[in-house]
Amino acid sequence: SAFLDKRLITNDILYSNYICNLAWFSSERFSKQKIIDYILHYNSLDINDENYMTENFADTYFSRQDCSRIGFIRQDIEDEFLAGALNERERAILITSLLYAMDKIANTCGHYDAYRQGVEFDRHLELAVPTPKQNRRKNQCYNENANELVKRIQADLVYIDPPYNSRQYCDAYHLIENVARWQMPEVSGVARKPDRSALKSEYCTRQAETAFEDLIEHITARYILLSYNNMANKGNDRSNAKISDEVIMRVLEAKGTVEVFSETYKAFTTGKSNIEGNEERLFLCLSLIHISEPTRH
């Protein structure tokens, strides 16, 4: 659901997630039939031409032929958008369909830090037709640093889901981000990664607690809902939470009253560790410093 009766504001520092947010939540009108026609055309393609994807990723995360199709489709979406045949949301919907199709067949163990070598590529690219809604006209989608964005917006409820540990999302999903941006940078290493320095999150570093305190301080909302797990110091240094429970509670309680909800879950691992007692927690803060009246749209 896109919360059709509410005004929705989304933000993500990764362009790939921003594109998906545009596809699902943007208020721009789009043609369902146009989307269907493009996807039927893309799924009928039988090509094996050289392009950026074949030159850099053939027989790694995808077969050479699927790389050829991915590269052709992504370039065609851009060409059609620049020619005026697609509006911004239609472009986002088609890119989202491509990214989802890629992720469904990718030769990985759940992320793009590495690919499995010597495997048979038995699954091939097939785009599905997304079914987004015609949303409210005042929805907004952003692609920027959350700590800066919150200084300019206000809401009834702000939901925050920052990275928990030192594993940067731009590292784990570099290929998805690369195709979404389509700037065709040089890549290096076994994992074929581009330069990602501009996408690094402070929430994965020793600056996480300082960044968190700054974020909460500048939020203008009646409710703040934070998602953060209880890894603390249970795993290795890369897996451990960067923001302690003590800091979370101190910062939120300075803003208002806090209630915590939790649910157990099995953590994702590559089979090298077995960490038990994992909980996903929601920290709900009723802010004592917020806009005087809830926003009505």
Question: Can you annotate each of these PLM segments?
Answer:
Residues E144-E148:
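Conserved SAM/SAH-binding loop
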Residues A2-F3, I19-A23, R152-A155, Q168-E177, ...:
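A short acidic (Asp/Glu
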Residues R7-I9, I13-P132, C170-T205, T210:
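Class I S-adenosyl-L-methionine-dependent methyltransferase module
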Residues S201-G256:
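Conserved Class I SAM-dependent methyltransferase catalytic core
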Residues P132-N139:
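A short helix-to-beta-strand connector/capping loop
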Residues S1-A2, T10-Y15, K151-A172, I224-N229:
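Conserved proline-anchored active-site loop of SAM-dependent methyltransferases
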Residues K242-L288:
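Class I S-adenosyl-L-methionine
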Residues I289-H297:
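Conserved small/polar residues in nucleotide/adenosyl-binding loops
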